[in-house]
Amino acid sequence: MLLILDSNEYIFGFGAFKKPACEMLLDIISDTFPIHSIRIPRLIAEEVGRHLTPEEFREFIGFITNLTTIDEDFVVPFELGVQYELKGLKPADAFIAAYVEWTGADALVTENRHFLTKHSNLPFKIINAKDCLSLIKSTSR
C-alpha cells in the first residue's frame, strides 16, 4: 500500500508534541516496508523542517532516506494541480491532492485536510493516522 503522509504526521511523530497514532504509524511503515511504502514531495519535507528542531529534523530525514527519496515539486504535472484548484482548493492543497494522484497512492494520511473528503470522486482515500493503522491491520490478516 502506497501512502502519502501529510506534514502533520511527521511533525506529530518526530516533534516535541507527539501523537501516539502518528508515532505508531511511522513505526509500522518502517517495520513493514516495502509492503507499506511512502512518497514525499519537497513541499511537505520543507514544511516538516520548519516545525522540528534540527535534531528532530535529522531523525526525520534519516527515516525518509531509509524508505524513499524526496520528489521535487516540479515533477508533478502543472495541469493536474490546476484541475484541483478549479475544484476550489487553495494552491498548496491542490498541489498535495495532485501529488497524491500523480504518485498513484492509495491514501493521503492527514490530521487536518479532511475537507478534501467533500470533493467527490477523488482517486485516493483521505484518512487520519488512527484510521490508517486500522486499515493496515485489517489488510495484514
Residue ranges and their predicted role:
Residues 37-72:
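Short, surface-exposed acidic-centric catalytic microdomains
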Residues 2, 37, 107-108, 124:
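A residue-level structural signature of the nucleotidyltransferase/glycosyltransferase Rossmann-like core
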Residues 70-113, 117:
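Active-site neighborhoods of divalent-metal-dependent phosphate/nucleic-acid chemistry enzymes
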Residues 46-47, 73-81, 131-137:
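A short acidic, often aromatic-flanked loop/helix-cap motif at beta-alpha or helix-coil junctions
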Residues 106, 113-141:
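Acidic, PIN/NYN-like endoribonuclease modules and their adjacent C-terminal/linker elements
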Residues 12-13, 47-49, 116-118:
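Short catalytic/ligand-binding loop motif for oxyanion handling, primarily in non-cytosolic enzymes
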